[in-house]
Amino acid sequence: MQQPNVLPVDMKVLMNHIYEYQKGVRRMVLFTLNRKYEEFAIRRLESQNISYIVQPVGSDRLNLYFGREECLNAIRMIVTRPLNLLTPEEDFMLGTMLGYDICAQCERYCERKNRCTNQCNGNCDNQCKNAS
C-alpha cells in the first residue's frame, strides 16, 4: 500500500501562515525554515501570487518574509543585516510590523535600549547594535 504524501510539520506551519495571510489575519509573516524546503515554500508562495523576501540564516536555514508589498518594501530598508544585529529601534519596528504583542514589544525595546545604554554610555552607534 502506497503511503500518501505527508507534509513535514514546518510546511504545515507555512501553509497555516499562508492561510492566515490570505484571510487578512496577518499582513506580513516571518517564517524561518530549513533550506531544504526553500523550493517548496517559494513555489507555493508564487502559485498564490504572494510577494516574498528570502534572507539566509547561517548555512542551513532561511528567513522567509511574505505579505503585502508595502510591508516588504519597509523590510528591505529595515532588515539589511542578520536579525541579531538589528538596533533596538529596528527590532521594535520589525516586531510591531509582524503583529507581535505591542506591550511585549515595548518591554523588549526598553530592555534592549537600557542594555545598550549601559554598555556604551548612551552612544549606541555601532557598539550595541547586536544587543538582543
How would you describe each model-predicted region?
Residues M1-S132:
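Domain-length accessory/inserted modules outside core catalytic folds
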